[in-house]
Amino acid sequence: AHIKTESCYRLRLLLTQRRNLKRKVLDLENTIRHSLKAFGIRIKGTGRTGFDKAVREAVAGDALTSELMDAMLTARAALWKEYGRLHDLVVKMVAKSELCRRFMAIPGVGPVTALSFMTAIDDPTRFRRSRDVAAYFGLTSRRWQSGTSIDVQGRISKAGDADVRRSLYEAASGLMTRFKGKDKVKTWGQQIAKRSCHRKAVVAVARK
């Protein structure tokens, strides 16, 4: 198994803890939403910035619940602040890396995807072909032999680092759906989508 360098491990740790803080923010938001549903209050469609205001307004007439929600929202705000701090640190590290900046020249690739990919690869010489990289992240089809010895391809294997695979998929999806400019890979993906389906096209673009 490949042993990552210490500098690479530090960057991976930064990405991991950034993700953990974001998940805790989402967990708190879901807890607040679920708690208020007991009173028939639904908080939805507010966006992250409007969430705090919407919750406070919804419980304004209930002193006890207002105090409880204030504590929850204060905790959420603190977590969100520290999440932003780690995200800014990711952006700072990416700005220092020429390789990451080159990754970000690809439409759809942001700082998190660039740093995740770079640190997951660490040493590119350990891969002989680009397909080996795709297989490493579980983006290639699983293969097995049927009873008649026919080689059968199934869904992607989903082996390896799930976070990197998710980042690559999201970057590919962004290229396919949100990027408005012209791009050879996007055009290639659109052709696959016409022959097959959008999901398979996005996976194919992610492999690229």
Q: Model-found features: residue ranges?
A:
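A detector of single, family-specific signature residues
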Residues: 1-208
